[in-house]
Regions:
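Nuclease catalytic cores that cleave nucleic-acid phosphodiester bonds
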Residues: 60-172
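Domain-level signal for Mg2+-assisted phosphodiester chemistry and nucleotide/NA-binding surfaces
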Residues: 1-98, 138, 147
Length: 172
């Protein structure tokens, strides 16, 4: 009897983007349950990589959370938040743009996987997703309505709304 090999899966979580999506939805997901669910959901898969990207106020910020992510098997990438002035709103906001780090990790590890789950709604990933798909990589994007760029949704093989998987991944 011939069995099909398991898909090789990599998960990329744009932590800041997902924080706002979860805040909008009024519930938060559990990073451990995310791994467990998507390993089973995206065809039966072997998890080869899981990356989590987040901005920090200072080097000690979110230390406990970051340590927990690492113990679950995530590779955590961080950047210190920078303050920006928004001329339109007249307010300062903080941002740590980790898009380049996400794309670099996607392409640096591309030979290791054939399926990707990207947790982000950022349209800046459109071209990277198109290029990965041209190499026969299956891409699933997870975000929430009203926070996913049309370009990203159109570029992906599959879109999953966070609310549709809430019962599987919500933090207890």
């Amino acid at each position: 009897m011939h069995t099909q090999p398991l898909s090789r899966l990599s998960i990329f979580v744009d932590g800041n983007n997902m924080f706002y999506a979860q805040q909008k939805n009024g519930w938060f997901f559990d990073p451990k349950r995310v791994l467990e669910y998507f390993i089973k959901e995206i065809v039966p898969s072997t998890l080869v990589n899981a990356f989590w990207y987040t901005g920090l106020k200072d080097p000690q910020d979110q230390r406990g959370f970051r340590d927990a992510l690492i113990s679950l098997g995530y590779t955590v990438r961080t950047k210190i938040l920078k303050e920006y002035y928004d001329d339109n709103s007249g307010r300062y906001s903080q941002k740590a743009n980790l898009d380049i780090e996400i794309v670099v990790d996607m392409f640096n590890t591309a030979a290791q996987y054939d399926r990707v789950v990207l947790f982000s709604g950022d349209g800046d990933f459109e071209r990277a997703i198109e290029l990965l798909r041209s190499k026969n990589t299956h891409i699933t994007v997870v975000s929430t309505e009203g926070m996913i760029a049309r370009e990203l949704r159109n570029a992906t093989d599959r879109y999953i709304d966070l609310n549709s998987v809430r019962k599987y991944i919500e933090k207890d």
